[in-house]
Amino acid sequence: MNLLPNLTLIIGGACSGKTSFAENLTLNNGPNNLYIATAEPFDKEMKSKIDLHQKSRALQKWKTVEAFHNLAETLDGMKEVKFDTILIDCLTMWLTNKFLKNKDLPQEFSRLVESVREQKMKLVIVTNELGYGIVPDNKMAREFRNLNGQLNQQIAAEADLVIQVVAGLPRTLKGSLPKVSNDY
């Protein structure tokens, strides 16, 4: 099928439908896909959400790898394996994991962008847009929001296709949206 360009970024707010849209887009690109999940189950609510996502993916026969911290290394390790598309869900959760560990984030961003650039398979990356809300009331939250925006800009600059999802509806910000089926 091969409908997608090399790098597609799907961006949207919380519960905007971005993950469902990204999954459908990926499945339309071919049947042999890898799902890189980045959400770490740090509390009961998150564990429940992850369980729901895992059950949904199992029905669609996704191959899944978890990459809570080592996303660039995980992508690098996929160079010898052949998939139609690699879906990363989600960049903001990966950033959360790194932020909480106080890693050198600018260096981590550079490393990830380099891995994305070098990837030979089609990539679909899901991320959150945090800049539409109110300005956070504390320094740590403002710093996180700013870092998320910086990372999104770096990935969007590399992307061939950038799609914003609002209320389950896609809007193309960069590139051309391929015609896809909603049968998945």
Model-derived features with residue positions:
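Short, glycine/serine-rich, charged loops/turns that create anion-binding
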Residues: 15, 40, 92, 130-131
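Residue-level signal for inorganic ion chemistry
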Residues: 22, 53, 87, 128, ...
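Helix-adjacent hinge/juxtasegments
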Residues: 60-108
